[in-house]
Amino acid sequence: MREKYLFTAVGRLTRTRDQRGIECPMIILGGKEYLLDLQELLLWSCLNWRIVKKEEINALYDKLSNGSGYVPSRTLDACINRMITRGLIVSGSGETEYDALYDLLSSMYIIPICDKPLLQFLTVARLVLMNRVKISIARKILRRDQKSADEKRVMDLARQALLSTAEIIRCIEMDVTSLPDSDSIMEAIYNDRETTSDNIGDLVKAAPCTKEVLVAVANLYQRKQLIFDRV
């Protein structure tokens, strides 16, 4: 059986200035800074908040770069390989798409994007009062980020500590809801002689809650509720 592959982008996009004062795109990943050229920026942007198959990357890249007039010096495949080597694009593989998704996400560290419901409500209310947005549309905006029970559990844990998907699976498997300090993390996740940060992904793959957590993480990511990081 031919292996399945899935890809996504990791890190947080920001901007900096070079020695000439020119603004440049940059990815923050694992506390390190990575400058991007235009082709790398286009490719990273195609995959950010998406989980895609290899054959889908070309179409996404062509759609984003169409009309830019930019002619890169390398092929798209060469750029993909370079970004994978730099760690800015990650891939997962497996016999099934579920296996590939687990391989992709299990080692990813989850960083929730700060959501401010009160600020969102006040902004939408202001637009309604100014007749910029209809009430029916406002209701849809405010409903957009409603989360399932599994998604809420993932976000609650991720807000307390920097955890990988596999570590969140272990927490939910052990019914852990509070992680006030590093000692509680070690006690909840690495409280036996067998579990390490290197093998936890393999150990929790068959846990009863794994599928639900994996789907929750993937859905939250594709709804732009979180980003992935590496340590």
Where are these regions (language model features)?
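A structured, charge-rich N-terminal accessory region that forms the first stable segment of a protein
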Residues: R2-L6
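N-terminal ordered "arm"
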Residues: F7-W49
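Long, charge-rich, low-complexity alpha-helical segments
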Residues: Y34-V231
